[in-house]
Amino acid sequence: WEATKKSPISTSDLAWRVERVRLPLAATLQRDTLEKTLADTTANDRDRLNASTKLALLNRTDAGHQFELTRLRLGSVNVLHMPGELFVEYQLAAQQMKPDATVCMAAYGDYAPGYIGTEIAYTQGGYEVQASSSNTAPAVEKVLMDAMRRLLTD
């Protein structure tokens, strides 16, 4: 704490910005299959819970829900608030978008999307981008990167 560099800030150093986006959902989110799983009283509780959360995401999306991405600026420090569990590439890209400032990222703002991979990660496979872990489509990377760029532009 004692080694922390402290800087005074004024109201002109503070900013709050919001970008709303629709996240492209995974093709594996099939309403009829999820509804059957949820209605199946012989299915295990974990599968039924998973189906219910995925159905809730589908319902929110169908109703026009947009996810809020936000930026808090405190002087030269920027904090992005993001949905889901993001791959580290999003943090690295955010820092490159604003190389002369500190950029921090706080994810898990809304966990409905689950893991959010990069476009290429969905073709490479792995736990984080499989149907049980991620509810987003590969196109999500462009949506989020574009929104991050808009947020970080002064």
Spans of features found by a protein language model:
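Non-catalytic substrate/cofactor recognition surfaces at enzyme active-site rims
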Residues: 1-154
